[in-house]
């Protein structure tokens, strides 16, 4: 099996349904769950939501798989708590890199398909947070932090953000960490969703998708 053959990786469980995936995540103490969005019994979105909401599974990351990068259900998976996605025909080496990226605590985002997908899905009005909670949270960000968040939302990594804003990579990383703390975001994937839903970034504006 591909994952078992990779250094430092071990498959600790497999599941045929979303409900089984949640149960296996609990019983096997997995570090990461590779989740198919379309599964019987309980779809991958709801399974991801349950894993993210389970205090006993804190720290378990979810990487979702989809057949097409136009599958807008991926956005719902990111909202539910997934840390990224890959299409099923991804090259084996890229799949392993993606697993390593998410397992290390980063979100699997890129300026390409992920940003385009999120932008398309969020063109429809999102359900606003109660009492304008998201915009109010953004008020706690400094001007520089808003700039950094906007670049995160476009899929830039810390090194790219540093280059764009003439910062050191460490400073860029520190800004991202502070933003995540202020917005109570799990990871960069959630920061992307928050940036679009709050209106900080709009599709097609200033180079956004």
Question: Where do the protein language model's features map onto the residues?
Answer:
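Recognition helix of helix-turn-helix DNA-binding domains
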Residues: 155-190
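Active-site beta3 strand of CheY-like receiver
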Residues: 28-34
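Receiver (REC) domain active-site loop signature in two-component systems and cognate sites
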Residues: 39-40
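Acidic catalytic/metal-coordinating carboxylates
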Residues: 17-20, 43-49
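Basic, Lys/Arg-enriched C-terminal extension of HTH/homeodomain DNA-binding domains
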Residues: 180-209
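Short hydrophobic/Thr-rich beta-strand motif most characteristic of the beta2 strand and flanking loop
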Residues: 8-16, 24, 185
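Active-site residues of response regulator receiver
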Residues: 36, 66
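Short, flexible helix-to-coil linker/hinge segments that flank and couple to helix-turn-helix
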Residues: 74-79, 84, 89-143, 147, ...
């Amino acid at each position: 099996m591909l994952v078992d053959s990779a250094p430092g990786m071990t498959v600790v469980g497999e599941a045929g349904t979303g409900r089984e995936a949640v149960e296996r995540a609990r019983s096997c103490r997995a570090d990461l769950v590779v989740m198919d969005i379309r599964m019987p019994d309980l779809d991958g979105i709801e399974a991801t939501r349950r894993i993210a909401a389970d205090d006993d599974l804190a720290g378990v990351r979810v990487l979702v798989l989809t057949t097409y990068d136009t599958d807008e259900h991926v956005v719902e998976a990111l909202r539910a708590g997934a840390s990224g996605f890959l299409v099923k025909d991804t090259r084996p080496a890229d799949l392993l890199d993606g697993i390593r990226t998410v397992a290390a605590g980063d979100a699997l985002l890129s300026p390409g398909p992920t940003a385009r997908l999120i932008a398309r899905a969020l063109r429809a009005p999102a359900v606003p947070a109660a009492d304008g909670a998201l915009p109010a949270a953004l008020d706690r960000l400094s001007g520089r932090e808003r700039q950094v968040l906007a670049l995160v939302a476009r899929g830039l990594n810390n090194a790219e953000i540093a280059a764009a804003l003439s910062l050191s990579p460490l400073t860029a990383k520190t800004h991202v960490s502070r933003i995540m703390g202020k917005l109570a975001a799990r990871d960069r994937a959630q920061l992307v969703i928050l940036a679009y839903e709050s209106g900080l970034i709009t599709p097609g504006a200033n180079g956004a998708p």
